[in-house]
Curated annotation (Swiss-Prot):
Pfam family of the protein (one): tRNA_m1G_MT
Primary gene name: Trmt10A
UniProt name for this protein: tRNA (guanine(9)-N(1))-methyltransferase Trmt10A
Taxonomic path: Eukaryota, Metazoa, Ecdysozoa, Arthropoda, Hexapoda
Disrupted-gene phenotype: RNAi-mediated knockdown is viable and adult brains show reduced levels of m1G9 tRNA modification and enrichment of m6A modification on mRNA transcripts, in particular those encoding Hsp70 chaperone proteins.
Keyword Nucleus: yes
Region called Disordered, residue ranges: 16-87, 275-319
Natural source organism: Drosophila melanogaster
Amino acid sequence: MDTTEKALKEVTPAMLSLNNCPGTTPGTPMSKNQLKKQRKLAEFAELRKLRREREREKKKQKRREAKELGLPVRTGPSRKELKKRQLADGGKSGLSVAIDLDYDDLMQERDIVKCVKQCLRIYTINRRSPQPGNLHFTGIRRNGHIHESFKKNEGWENWHVQYYFDRGHTDIFEHSQLVYLTCESDRVLDKLQPGCTYVIGGLVDHNHFKGLCHSRATSAGLTTARLPLSEHVDMKTRAVLSTYHVFELLTKVAAGQDWTTAILETIPMRKGAKAKITDKKEPNHCLEQQDEKQKQEAESDKPTLTAVESEIESHSLDS
């Protein structure tokens, strides 16, 4: 039994008392539901710390075992290498993306948690990209629901991201530099333009606020565009992607992939995407060879000019 498992068993009711609950003051009357919720929050926070400690110990043990067996300890780049790669590039890939998080009051608590998790995945995708871009999280309301959810992620302040509190993308960038990506737009984004910042709406709404991002963008006088999904693939479902899928797609295209390949590698399999079949026919070399052979046979069956002249001459002599 490791130290963490022992610690998990040693969690006492005193550790989960209201005195250890965040946001509570002794002597303040609380309802039964509030007390129950606070106890659950305290228990979750305490157990999460212990689980993380156990996970770290397991990773250390795996590294030790790998070293003893002479196996490679790490399969991917180290944190130091990733940081060095990002700083060396400095956003030279030309990709600049702003995640619009000014939807704090429109999402339920569970959707806010999902939104922040997507931001974490976006940050990870950008760090691991061969050409990391400039990433901006805009419109965060200080001490709002999204801000509080960010605080639950240890080390979030150290992410290599530009945070903007109480400031939206229109307060930071020139309007002419912004392109808001929405599936309702009439314009198609066929090429990433240098000097542009592409805005992705950080809204997890399950289609409750359909068209809201597009409406806000047009009201602000911003250029909008949609991803060229229908131009490159056929899908069984609507061409609506999550925030981090849109960012991942942009990252791959910025790194040099073509749209079709990037789309097929990014979107979930449940959407049943298949590359669009074009009308342009590929040359069939087998048919070409067969046609050439038939042409040669036809030419050989034709009487040559010399043969025709000889036959005419023989008829003249007979007469």
